């Protein structure tokens, strides 16, 4: 059975990045002199991996969450998934892959301002279909130039016949990774913006002091982004997973199995006007991931309220 994503991060308004930790199997040195050895663990989960685990690329992919595209392809392979509010009251995912990159991910959709703050600290490759002019300009200014951008028109970005646009764009990860590895200018596609200035520094983190709090027992979690996006989670003590539903309908993987995750993080942040209209002329929200606020970390059937703080986007 496929292991579930380690962390699923979402918010009452949008999202903010946190990390998880776990066991590791770092090998010791065989020499007489002490030697620093890179632990054989995956960067995003902290779980044991191959010796070169931390050298594997981290790929962030924007994925649609409209009801007509479910079940999506590849989400159950992600190490980390962000959920964010977009126009029309719908939500979308930024799925992050490293330890288990599937052959296909999709449907791939467009970028938003908030994705820069999500991808910048962690991504080697950022995959999205395209974006509004203001968003693409912001991306060119703020996303680190070391992050390869892959958009429609790039190798591995394919439109599926028989599937209605715009939800027919899917990522062939093997084709994309091969193209990025072989390219001197790995960003590719129709909509890659030219970088305009140096990117903002990625936020730093510090280890917390003291023992971890015990937390309060929780059996269900209900989140309302809008009347259209109301994800619910129920703790499954047998499988040790939070199982997702969309309203009253179970959220499933492509093979029909139920979608679950080990950990949930709920972030309370602000939404402001992005300054442009969507394709249907409606308001486009912009999630603000700088500042501070409340958050809830849920794991092993328990919830702990915490405070988040992030000085810059």
PLM regions with names:
Residues 17-20:
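C-terminal motif of bacterial Sec signal peptides marking the signal peptidase cleavage site
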Residues 1-8:
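Bacterial N-terminal signal peptides that target proteins for export
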Residues 38-56, 60-78, 87-313:
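A surface/extracellular/periplasmic glyco- and lipid-processing/surface-interacting theme
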Residues 22-25:
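Bacterial signal peptide processing site
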């Amino acid at each position: 059975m496929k292991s579930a994503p380690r962390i699923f991060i979402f918010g009452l308004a949008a999202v903010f990045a946190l990390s998880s930790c776990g066991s590791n199997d770092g090998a010791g040195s065989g020499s007489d002199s002490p030697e620093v050895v890179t632990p054989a663990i995956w960067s995003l989960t902290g779980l044991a991996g191959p010796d070169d685990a931390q050298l594997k690329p981290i790929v962030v992919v924007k994925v649609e969450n409209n009801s007509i595209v479910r079940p999506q392809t590849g989400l159950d392979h992600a190490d980390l998934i962000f959920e964010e509010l977009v126009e029309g009251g719908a939500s979308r995912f930024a799925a992050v892959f490293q330890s288990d990159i599937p052959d296909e991910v999709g449907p791939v959709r467009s970028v938003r301002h908030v994705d820069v703050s999500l991808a910048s600290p962690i991504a080697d490759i950022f995959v999205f279909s395209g974006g509004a002019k203001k968003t693409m300009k912001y991306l060119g200014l703020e996303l680190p130039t070391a992050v390869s951008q892959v958009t429609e028109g790039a190798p591995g970005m394919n439109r599926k016949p028989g599937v209605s646009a715009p939800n027919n764009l899917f990522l062939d990860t093997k084709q994309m990774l091969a193209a990025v590895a072989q390219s001197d200018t790995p960003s590719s596609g129709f909509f890659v913006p030219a970088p305009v200035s140096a990117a903002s520094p990625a936020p730093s983190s510090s280890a917390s002091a003291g023992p971890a709090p015990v937390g309060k027992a929780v059996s269900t979690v209900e989140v309302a982004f809008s009347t259209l996006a109301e994800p619910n989670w129920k703790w499954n003590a047998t499988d040790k997973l939070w199982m997702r539903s969309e309203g009253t309908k179970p959220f499933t993987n492509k093979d029909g199995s139920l979608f679950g995750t080990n950990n949930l993080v709920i972030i309370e942040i602000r939404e402001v006007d992005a300054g442009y209209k969507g394709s249907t002329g409606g308001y486009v929200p912009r999630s603000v991931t700088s500042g501070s606020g409340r958050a809830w970390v849920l794991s092993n059937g328990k919830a702990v309220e915490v405070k988040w703080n992030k000085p810059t986007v």
